[in-house]
A protein has these predicted regions:
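Extracytoplasmic
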Residues: 3-126
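Active-site neighborhood of glycoside hydrolase catalytic domains
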Residues: 4-8, 125-175
C-alpha cells in the first residue's frame, strides 16, 4: 500500500511483510509481484491484514493505493477499517487474466499521528452480502432525504424501507 495527500506524491509505502496477518491470512512468496511477497486468504470471512504504524503528518484526507494481484472475471471485495472507526468498501474490478500489479485507489480520512488500517472481507455468505448491501442502501436513503430537505428547506420525510427477498437471505435475522 501507499499513502499520500490527494494530488501529491506518496509519503509512505508499506509492503505485505510489514503488516500483521491473522485469522488465516498469510504472507506468501510470489515472484510475479514487485517486491516478491503478497498477502493471501483475505476473502470469504477469512483473514485480516493490519498495519498499525501508519503515521499521518496532519488530520485530513489521504489517497490510499492498494497494489493487488488477482485473476478472474469476478469482482472482489475488501473492507479497509481505519482506526477501528470508519469502514471503506473496496471493489476490485474483474480481469481477463492474472494481474500482478493492479492498483485500486480510495480516499480515506486519517488523524494526525498514529493510525491503523485493517483489511478484511466480512462476506462469508449470501446473507452477509445482503446485510451489507441493504445497510448501505438504508444509509444512503437517509442521506438523500436529509440532503433533499436541507436543499429545499422542507422537513425531512420518513421512508418506509421494506426487506423481503422471499426469505432467501433470512432478513428477519438482521433487518
Amino acid at each position: 500500500i501507499t499513502l499520500g495527500k490527494p494530488g501529491e506524491e506518496a509519503f509512505l509505502e508499506m509492503q505485505a511483510e510489514h503488516g500483521i496477518v491473522s485469522k488465516g491470512a498469510k504472507v506468501v512468496a510470489d515472484e510475479k509481484v514487485e517486491n516478491g511477497y503478497m498477502v493471501s486468504n483475505l476473502c470469504g470471512g477469512l483473514g485480516e491484514l493490519l498495519f498499525d504504524t501508519i503515521e499521518a503528518p496532519e488530520d485530513g484526507d489521504y489517497s490510499l493505493t492498494i497494489v493487488f494481484r488477482k485473476g478472474g472475471l469476478k469482482r472482489k471485495f475488501l473492507v479497509c477499517l481505519v482506526n477501528d472507526e470508519k469502514e471503506y468498501d473496496c471493489y476490485f474490478p474483474s480481469s481477463k487474466g492474472f494481474t500482478p500489479d493492479g492498483r485500486l485507489q480510495i480516499v480515506i480520512n486519517l488523524k494526525k499521528g498514529l493510525n491503523t488500517l485493517k483489511f478484511y472481507n466480512p462476506v462469508a455468505s449470501r446473507m452477509d452480502s445482503a446485510q451489507r448491501q441493504y445497510t448501505n442502501m438504508g444509509r444512503e436513503l437517509q442521506r438523500a432525504t436529509r440532503e433533499f430537505a436541507e436543499k429545499n428547506g422542507t422537513p425531512e420525510k420518513p421512508i418506509c424501507y421494506s426487506l423481503c427477498e422471499w426469505g432467501m437471505n433470512q432478513p428477519w435475522k438482521w433487518g
